[in-house]
């Protein structure tokens, strides 16, 4: 685990890094824009690539999905493809030459992901989605709403404990 919490102070203005209220309700560009953390996936993926090269790994994985494309620019297919190309150039000659970025859910909805995870026995009670933080999911933020809907659409029981 790499502690990058200090970077959040530099990326102020987001509900995820600052004292800005997390919007409630469903995902919509007008209310979820405040949850954008500029360049967050590029930052985390750059660190992951550095670690992968140091460990001689052949894969860096990320879990961006189709539902994030319209709100978060660094979750779009064009970003993922360009980032992989950039990193291949950045680490050329170091580590495993087959190192690549793996984004298996890039074109999948949350419901499709939940269905796949259900079939694989993913311990969903141990996963986290809520933007509010805390001990339990709030059930009101966009990610909690999408989580509940994804389980319902996938026909998979939702083991999540919600506050409300």
Named regions from a protein language model:
Residues 1-121:
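ATP-dependent adenylation/nucleotidyltransferase module used to activate substrates
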Residues 46, 126-149:
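Local cysteine-cluster metal-coordination motifs and their immediate loop/turn environment
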Residues 95-96, 149, 161-163:
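Short, intrinsically disordered/low-complexity patches at protein termini
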Residues 133-134, 155-164:
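Short cysteine/histidine-rich metal-coordination sites, predominantly Zn2+-binding motifs
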Residues 142, 150-159:
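Short cysteine/histidine-rich zinc-coordinating motifs and their immediately flanking basic loops
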């Amino acid at each position: 685990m790499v502690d990058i919490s200090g970077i959040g102070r530099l990326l102020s203005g987001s509900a995820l890094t600052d004292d800005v209220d997390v919007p409630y309700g469903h995902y919509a560009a007008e209310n979820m824009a405040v949850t954008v953390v500029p360049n967050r996936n590029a930052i985390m993926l750059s660190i992951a690539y550095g670690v992968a090269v140091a460990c001689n790994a052949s894969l860096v994985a990320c879990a961006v999905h189709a539902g994030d494309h319209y709100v978060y620019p660094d979750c779009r297919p064009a970003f993922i493809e360009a980032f992989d190309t950039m990193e291949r150039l950045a680490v050329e000659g170091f580590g495993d030459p087959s190192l690549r970025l793996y984004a298996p859910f890039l074109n999948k909805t949350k419901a499709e992901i939940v269905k796949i995870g259900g079939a694989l026995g993913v311990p969903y009670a141990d996963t986290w989605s809520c933007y509010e933080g805390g001990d339990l999911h709030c059930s009101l933020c966009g990610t909690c709403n999408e989580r509940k809907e994804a389980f319902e659409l996938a026909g998979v029981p939702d083991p999540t404990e919600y506050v409300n």
